[in-house]
Amino acid sequence: PNSNQRRRGRQTYTRYQTLELEKEFKFNRYLTRRRRIELSHTLYLTERQIKIWFQNRRMKEKKEVQAIRELNEIEKTKLGGFLGSARSPSSTTSASCHGTGSSLSPPLMEMGGHSSAE
């Protein structure tokens, strides 16, 4: 392969670049082309580097959320044997309906029956 076809090495980002990218991700998980161009000029990165950073960051978030859900399911299974008889039918229905949502609260919060909103 000629020099144009060689694979590029892994990009390392400065703390400042990472901080700015994380701040942007917090507000926008997806960037418009215009915003990507602005960031590339501000952070001295290419548009492609920014695009790939955001793709990787979204995948990291997806994996983290999935891991938390799996841990919550394990905890629900463990606690189900001890607290299964203490659950009312409405709390079981509520937990199963909300299990696919974005809430990442521990399962004990769902079983308490009281919330700060009440």
From Swiss-Prot:
GO biological process, one term: anterior/posterior pattern specification
Region Disordered: start-end pairs: 81-118
DNA-binding region(s) from the entry: 6-65
Family designation: Belongs to the Antp homeobox family.
One term under GO cellular component: nucleus
Keyword tags: Developmental protein, DNA-binding, Homeobox, Nucleus
Organism: Hirudo medicinalis
The protein's name: Homeobox protein LOX2
Its biological purpose: Sequence-specific transcription factor which is part of a developmental regulatory system that provides cells with specific positional identities on the anterior-posterior axis.
Keyword DNA-binding among UniProt keywords: yes
Molecular-function GO terms, alphabetical: DNA-binding transcription factor activity, RNA polymerase II-specific; RNA polymerase II cis-regulatory region sequence-specific DNA binding
Biased composition (Low complexity): 85-96
Signal peptide: none
Classification via SMART domains: HOX (SM00389)
Cell compartments where the protein resides: Nucleus
InterPro entries, sorted: Antp_homeobox, HD, HD_metazoa, Homeobox_CS, Homeodomain-like_sf
Primary localisation category: nucleus
